[in-house]
């Protein structure tokens, strides 16, 4: 990066020593620690992130609504609390972003559709309120595909979000705005949602970490579309950040029961003891036997296995039976049932929909419409395959596998030739969809970079309610991997 393009360094001693233009970017926990020690001001941190939004958002198109004066007002209040010696939370003064399908008071909550254009949230979703209670400064909201129905982020309201590693490629979807903002240092962390890979795939594409929790572990109250029916089995909200430790802090802050979400469960956060973690056998597979993956994706899984083995973990080849059945059942829930649920909202407005959403609904239209009997059969089928895989995972309660068949793809691509086989758009993401259908927690962590300079992540998957375990394994993997540099700043 040329000196002419380098952002001016702050006079603050912390920022002079390690500016956010260098890699790796500071973690949310590091920022919070420096604020508590009075080595950096919350106002300075907020200004720095606002400067980065101003500089990089025009090329990334990650943020769609942010209010600098409101951000600075939050930061001044955080600074006052520090100067007064008040007790502060674990995220005090840390700037976070929120996906624009989750309510943030005074901000747009449009879910990328013209049918909700101009909709402003009147109050914070409970998870946002919990982040504020922990001291977070909310920067604003980030871009999504229309109605969250795509694995890339583009819509007719705000346009396309680009990947900070390569602007000609997608940041993923549907939490693509979040992933791009966090990877490029516009935000220190944030919140996405995931009904079929929408946290994990953007995290994989952008080289950050993201957790899809068990349904009900974090309340989805205040999210649009609302969680209910089949969606309550699949869709969740979850944390995204640059490090596993940051993901864990965000998870612990947001987790807990809320009466606005019928699926929310009062499950306490349970720390994992080192011996308990070390006693767990980890299974891994490089592909599912149906959809091939790129060589660099295989290498990422192999690298993760080597790192854990070198750290003393038992890691064995293991691919549970029933994954293809889970994929087909996911589509019957998410695609067919989703189309039925959202159909009344969309009917008569087809001309106002984005090309990507029209494409998605053309795929769902090819499937038989659910009757009450077929929906019940699908529901029962889900329970049966879930039991089948859970029994197999008694020996290997933690799995490592690819996140997707490919790294971030070029805008508009719809198929890829992998190992002599054409992989279609809908098939490339099956590695995420299984675990939505099954309700298993899964965290993505970047492991390596492809020959084209694109990040490659892996998934660490556990049994229901085992978020603490998958995060502990991910943290051990992160420690073995070492610091992650993030995207070249000139690409942002």
What are these regions (language model features)?
Residues 123-254, 436-457:
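Short glycine/serine-rich loop segments
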Residues 3, 12-73, 310-312, 486-492:
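An N-terminal boundary/leader segment
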Residues 38, 49, 93, 133, ...:
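Glycine-rich, small-residue loops and helix-cap segments
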Residues 81-156:
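Acidic/His- and Gly-rich active-site-bordering loop/insert found
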Residues 42-47, 76, 295-319, 342-351, ...:
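Acyltransferase
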Residues 212-303, 322, 344, 475, ...:
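A short helix-breaking turn/cap at a secondary-structure junction
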Residues 91-111, 274-285, 333-390, 402, ...:
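Short helix-loop capping/hinge segments that flank enzyme active sites or metal/cofactor-binding pockets
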Residues 49, 71, 247, 282, ...:
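Residue-level signal for inorganic ion chemistry
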């Amino acid at each position: 990066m040329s000196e002419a393009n380098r952002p001016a360094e702050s006079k603050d001693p912390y920022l002079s020593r390690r500016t956010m233009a260098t890699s790796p970017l500071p973690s949310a926990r590091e920022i919070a620690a420096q604020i508590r020690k009075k080595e950096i001001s919350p106002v300075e941190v907020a200004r720095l992130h606002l400067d980065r939004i101003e500089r990089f958002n025009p090329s990334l198109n990650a943020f769609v609504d942010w209010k600098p004066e409101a951000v600075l007002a939050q930061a001044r209040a955080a600074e006052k609390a520090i100067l007064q010696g008040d007790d502060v939370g674990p995220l005090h003064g840390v700037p976070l972003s929120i996906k624009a399908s989750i309510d943030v008071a005074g901000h747009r909550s449009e879910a990328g559709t013209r049918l909700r254009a101009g909709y402003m949230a009147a109050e914070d979703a409970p998870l946002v309120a919990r982040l504020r209670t922990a001291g977070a400064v909310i920067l604003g909201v980030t871009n999504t595909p229309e109605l969250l129905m795509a694995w890339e982020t583009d819509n007719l309201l705000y346009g396309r979000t680009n990947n900070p590693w390569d602007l000609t490629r997608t940041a993923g979807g549907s939490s693509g705005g979040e992933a791009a903002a966090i990877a490029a240092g516009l935000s220190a962390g944030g919140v996405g949602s995931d009904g079929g890979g929408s946290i994990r795939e953007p995290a994989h594409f952008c080289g950050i970490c993201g957790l899809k929790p068990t349904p009900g572990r974090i309340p989805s109250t205040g999210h649009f579309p609302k969680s209910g029916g089949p969606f309550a089995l699949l869709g969740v909200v979850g944390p995204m950040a640059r490090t596993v430790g940051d993901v864990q802090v965000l998870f612990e802050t947001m987790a807990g029961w809320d009466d606005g979400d019928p699926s929310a469960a009062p499950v306490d956060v349970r720390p994992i003891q080192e011996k308990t973690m070390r006693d767990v056998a980890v299974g891994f597979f490089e592909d599912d036997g149906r959809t091939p993956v790129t060589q660099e994706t295989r290498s990422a899984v192999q690298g993760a296995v080597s790192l854990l083995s070198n750290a003393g973990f038992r890691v064995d080849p293991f691919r549970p039976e029933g994954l293809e059945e889970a994929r087909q059942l996911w589509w019957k829930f998410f695609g067919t049932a989703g189309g039925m649920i959202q159909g009344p909202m969309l009917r008569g407005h087809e001309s106002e929909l984005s090309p990507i959403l029209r494409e998605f609904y053309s795929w769902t239209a090819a499937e038989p419409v659910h009757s009450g009997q077929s929906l019940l059969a699908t529901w029962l089928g889900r329970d049966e395959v879930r039991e089948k895989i859970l029994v197999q995972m008694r020996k290997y309660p933690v799995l490592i596998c690819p996140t997707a068949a490919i790294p971030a793809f070029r805008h508009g691509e719809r198929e890829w030739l992998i190992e002599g086989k054409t992989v279609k758009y809908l098939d490339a993401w099956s590695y995420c969809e299984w675990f939505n259908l099954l309700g298993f927690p899964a965290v993505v962590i970047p492991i390596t970079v492809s020959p084209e300079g694109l990040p490659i992540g892996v998934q660490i998957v556990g049994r229901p309610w085992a978020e603490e375990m998958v995060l502990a394994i991910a943290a051990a993997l992160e420690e073995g991997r070492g610091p992650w540099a993030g995207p070249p700043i000139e690409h942002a």
